[in-house]
Amino acid sequence: MQKDALNNVHITDEQVLMTPEQLKAAFPLSLQQEAQIADSRKSISDIIAGRDPRLLVVCGPCSIHDPETALEYARRFKALAAEVSDSLYLVMRVYFEKPRTTVGWKGLINDPHMDGSFDVEAGLQIARKLLLELVNMGLPLATEALDPNSPQYLGDLFSWSAIGARTTESQTHREMASGLSMPVGFKNGTDGSLATAINAMRAAAQPHRFVGINQAGQVALLQTQGNPDGHVILRGGKAPNYSPADVAQCEKEMEQAGLRPSLMVDCSHGNSNKDYRRQPAVAESVVAQIKDGNRSIIGLMIESNIHEGNQSSEQPRSEMKYGVSVTDACISWEMTDALLREIHQDLNGQLTARVA
């Protein structure tokens, strides 16, 4: 690394990582798994476009810090998904990267050992190995697209991705979303602004050229054709924004922008007033709107773990409680199971009219 009076003044170290090609060669997808992921992406695309009447439910831990916990959660989630599949399409949250308002643990890829060692190469390997195990269970997977380089390493394993509230306004992330191979949800801004998400969705649907890395790890000029499978995610802001009036306002603004109204409601964050225990109430309110004839709401997002609440990510790993989030607080598996079964029962036989 060149370091002198003008170059890398604030850089203290440089490590060359394995390339996306090398990671995929070490942890390859089978042809059957490729077909499975392509099929789940199509199912989600059909739901967003109104061709499939089911409700998309992106549900799971706020973040993944322990692969064993993730696998146990996935086994329960898979069994439930099979039981409710006629009206709900369940996709498991597998979030490895966490945007921070200031500082804090940035996720399993960035610091997999949670000790400040920042062993990113190990993080990428742990993440891809876990994703392959989850795909092998037959689960469609969701993530937040945060680092623009990560999709080259892991993007082939995901069926849906989100652009978060802190990055929806970023040109870098809009360009990245235009090239992602799966449907993408855009969250409204942290201030509640709908225009931020709607403009991002419009931008990502267009072709772009930008600098990124290719599968060989080389810096390359990438050209995209645009991503047609975008939708808005209402996550609240200074106040919740999932009421019928809020949903109608989002529909209006999307139509004015020339977009088909297609939106998901995040039951956590601003919509729960940051109280994880309110997520079921938010979900039930949204389901009531669907039962009343709403066709623009295509999905729900729920933060859920094996056990409820959260814990500090700064304590020693040996002292961490099993199955408890180290980022946002989550509802328990028992509450998740009961909620999704209730939604399934409420929507039973009521969704066929939603097909466009």
Swiss-Prot record:
One Gene Ontology molecular-function label: identical protein binding
E.C. numbers: 2.5.1.54
Keywords: Amino-acid biosynthesis, Aromatic amino acid biosynthesis, Transferase
Activation/inhibition comment: Specifically feedback inhibited by tyrosine with 50% inhibition observed at 9 microM tyrosine, pH 7.0.
Recorded GO CC terms: cytoplasm
Catalytic activity: D-erythrose 4-phosphate + phosphoenolpyruvate + H2O = 7-phospho-2-dehydro-3-deoxy-D-arabino-heptonate + phosphate
Pathway per the UniProt entry: Metabolic intermediate biosynthesis; chorismate biosynthesis; chorismate from D-erythrose 4-phosphate and phosphoenolpyruvate: step 1/7
InterPro entries the UniProt entry points to: Aldolase_TIM (IPR013785), DAHP1/KDSA (IPR006218), DAHP_synth_1 (IPR006219)
Recorded coiled-coil stretches: none
Pfam families according to UniProt: DAHP_synth_1
Cofactor: a divalent metal cation
Gene Ontology biological-process entries: amino acid biosynthetic process; aromatic amino acid family biosynthetic process; chorismate biosynthetic process
Other known facts: There are 3 DAHP synthases, AroF is feedback-inhibited by Tyr. The other 2 DAHP synthases are Phe- and Trp-sensitive, respectively.
Function: Stereospecific condensation of phosphoenolpyruvate (PEP) and D-erythrose-4-phosphate (E4P) giving rise to 3-deoxy-D-arabino-heptulosonate-7-phosphate (DAHP).
Membership in a protein family: Belongs to the class-I DAHP synthase family.
Protein name: Phospho-2-dehydro-3-deoxyheptonate aldolase, Tyr-sensitive
